Design a protein with these regions (language model features):
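Short beta-strand-to-turn element immediately C-terminal to the catalytic PLP-Schiff-base lysine
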Residues: 46, 54-56, 218, 244-245
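Short beta-strand to alpha-helix junction loop
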Residues: 72-80, 99-118, 165-171, 199
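Small-residue (primarily alanine) positions within well-ordered alpha-helices
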Residues: 16, 20-25
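Conserved dinucleotide-binding and phosphotransfer motif residues
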Residues: 27-29, 91, 123, 182
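Glycine-rich FAD pyrophosphate-binding loop
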Residues: 9, 25-49
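Beta1/beta-strand and adjacent pyrophosphate-binding region of the FAD-binding site
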Residues: 2-16
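Predominantly flavin-linked oxidoreductase catalytic cores and closely associated redox partners
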Residues: 111, 118-245
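Glycine-rich active-site loop/strand segments that organize a redox cofactor
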Residues: 51-99
Length: 245
């Protein structure tokens, strides 16, 4: 059975987990990733319909919905969209800008995933795949990880497990359980995005078609909001992601 100790252990090997591990290792920390998937970064391949919209030039507090949206300004100052583009450029990924949406010039999400994995390997980050974590214990400023593959220990633990919207890709809600066990307060997660159902015969003819459109919100007969979107029509209605965002 394995028994290893690190400065930093990142739980989750998706985009956030890989980026967190890369930055920790770049600062000199002995870093590892524990990923219950057999292949890290798998979810990245499905991002942006397989093209990976990895950042957006249109950023600011108005794009966030919370009690204190201004909190994001400090975060963006630390690592902006421009910093993200420069980061991937150094890894050999050129960017294509489509109205503020940034994609790898190759048009393939695998370019982003492969670049992150190569960088992680270059930095000596140890990625443990197929790890089933039973429990994470924080005691005396040290984290211990009880897994099906052995025990791991670290001074710092970064949770990058995703939410609970896509269990098949790894976002199964386990991160909330770990966070609570560390004493963090977790608000009850609620679904935020869902398709908007509609009954219209023309939807059958346009299913799968992508087009520019305008979404308008009416309250008491008056238009109170209007935003341009790119849509891919569905037979049962409209994709919720564009509408509710």
């Amino acid at each position: 059975m394995k028994q290893k100790t690190y400065d930093v252990i990142v739980v989750g090997g998706g985009a956030a987990g890989l980026m967190a591990a890369i930055h920790a290792a770049s600062g000199g920390a002995h870093t590892a990733i524990l990923d219950h998937h057999e292949v890290s970064g798998k979810k990245i391949l499905a991002t942006g319909n397989g093209k990976c919209n990895f950042t957006n030039l249109m950023q600011g507090e108005s794009y966030y919905r919370c009690d204190t949206p201004a909190f994001v300004l400090h975060i963006l100052e630390q690592f902006s969209a421009e910093d993200t583009i420069a980061f991937f450029r150094e890894l050999g990924v050129m960017t294509r800008d489509r109205q503020g949406y940034c994609y790898p010039r190759s048009g393939q999400a695998s370019a982003i995933r492969n670049a992150l994995l190569r960088k992680a390997e270059k930095l000596g980050i140890e990625i443990h795949n197929g790890i089933g974590i039973r429990k994470i214990i924080r005691e005396n400023n040290r984290f211990s990880f009880d897994t099906k593959s052995g025990s791991f220990f670290s001074t710092c633990c970064i949770l990058a497990t995703g939410g609970m919207a896509s269990p098949k890709s790894g976002s199964d809600g386990s991160g909330y359980i770990y966070a609570k066990s560390f004493g963090h307060t977790v608000k009850k997660p609620l679904p935020a995005l869902t398709a908007l159902m509609a009954e219209a015969n023309w939807l059958k003819e346009t299913t799968g078609v992508r087009a520019d459109a305008t979404v308008k919100l009416y309250v008491d007969g008056s238009c109170v909001a209007e935003v341009p979107v790119k849509y891919r029509w569905l037979i049962m209605g409209f994709p919720g992601f564009r509408l509710f965002r």
